[in-house]
């Protein structure tokens, strides 16, 4: 529970450790919602799987 409270006000990407920023204000430049990030990652994984099926190493 303590971990959840500590990350309560943070962006989900920063809280998950997916994005690290050294300067304040860098986060505002990215206009990506968590829902769109999930959609993009699923599409990327699907594309990689299709490419592996078409042309295996």
From Swiss-Prot:
Q: Does the keyword ATP-binding apply?
A: no
Q: List where in the cell it is found.
A: Cell membrane
Q: Which InterPro entries match?
A: Preprot_translocase_SecG, SecG/Sec61-beta/Sbh
Membrane topology field: Single-pass membrane protein
Q: Which stretches are transmembrane? A: 34-55
Keyword field: Cell membrane, Membrane, Protein transport, Translocation, Transmembrane, Transmembrane helix, Transport
Q: What is this protein called?
A: Preprotein translocase subunit SecG
Q: Indicate the principal place this protein occupies in or around the cell.
A: membrane
Return the similarity comment: Belongs to the SEC61-beta family.
Side Extracellular, residues: 56-57
User: What is the role of this chain?
Assistant: Involved in protein export. The function of the beta subunit is unknown, but it may be involved in stabilization of the trimeric complex.
| GO CC aspect terms | plasma membrane
Topology feature Cytoplasmic, residues: 1-33
Q: Name one Pfam family in it.
A: Sec61_beta
Tell me the GO BP annotations in alphabetical order. protein transport
Q: How does it assemble?
A: Component of the protein translocase complex. Heterotrimer consisting of alpha (SecY), beta (SecG) and gamma (SecE) subunits. Can form oligomers of the heterotrimer.
């Amino acid at each position: 529970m303590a971990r959840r409270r500590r990350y309560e006000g943070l962006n989900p990407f920063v809280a998950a450790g997916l994005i690290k920023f050294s300067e304040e204000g860098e986060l505002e430049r990215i206009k990506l919602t968590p829902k769109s990030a999930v959609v993009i990652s699923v599409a990327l994984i699907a594309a990689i799987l299709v490419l592996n099926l078409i042309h295996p190493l």
